[in-house]
Amino acid sequence: METIVRDAINSDKFSVLSFCKDTFSWGDYIQNVWDYWLSEGNLLVIEKQYPVGVCHAFFSKNQVWIEGIRINSNFRRQGFASDLVRHIELLAQEKQILSSFMLIDTENLPSLSMAKSLNYHIFQTWNFYSLSPQINNSHKIQFGNVLNSTATHYVKSWRWLVLDEETLLSLSVQNKIIFSGKFDDVSTAIITDSEHFDKTLIVTLFSGSQNNTLDLVSYIQNYSAENNYKKIQILTKEKLPFLHTLEHKITFTLMQKFLR
């Protein structure tokens, strides 16, 4: 039976969500973002009489971000995930986009193997931490852009987006870039609101010295508590110091492919 890749429609939602329930130990997030992704466009399904796989693409500044690849467990190992990725790559090439990125759990060996078979390589490794909001006044941070060229991306709603001069200026004007430089190497963070989950703060952290990082963490906790955030999600390439309010959740590989 022929399979086709097409744009998702709202009536696909029930059948798609039926195989997006137990992806992670805690469940899945597709049900929470389906409506957003559908309205954004580039939400794709692969069907064999009915949808057996789904994937979303987000195009921005000469890159495509591939997210939410899910395949019905009864149809895995048939190349459907690869078909979805290739379809998105073709869309990107039509837009003359040069790079494709996706994020994969370091322990998800089948997905890593699939990505490598499509000529993706490991670009960076990132750690995800959750932090509890709490009133904490033991901090002294500053606002402003002190990032160097090694900071290539920041995280916005779990998409790794390019940090170019225009973006840095916009974030700086909005006071979204904070730093602490009291002790040795400067630590810097970019704070943004999740576009898909209420009262969730997403932090991209570039950690310098441990004391500077702890200074930023204290500020972020206090800022979140004062502004009634429920969750703080920190993404960083570094290992963070131990705190009882800070929990390491998962480590990801950021995969990249240059599109010709």
Question: Where are the predicted features?
Answer:
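A short, internal acetyl-CoA/4′-phosphopantetheine-binding micro-motif in the GNAT/acyltransferase core
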Residues: 69-77, 203-212
